[in-house]
Amino acid sequence: MQYRLKVVFVDNEEIILEHTQKHGFSDDLELFEVTTADEIFVIPLKQIKYIACDSKIFKN
C-alpha cells in the first residue's frame, strides 16, 4: 500500500511524500526512515517538528 506522508521540519520547511511505502524509526531512535516508490529518506529526528500521514494505513 502506498500513502501520503508529510514531514515538517523545525525550521517550518516541509516535504510531502506521495508514494510512501513504509516509515519508521531507527533502532537507536535517532533517525526517521521513509521508503517511497523511488527513494529512501533518512532524517535525523532532531530536525523534525512533526509527522503526519494518511489515515488509510490504519484501516486494517
Predicted regions located by residue number:
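N-terminal acidic leader/helix
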Residues: 1-31
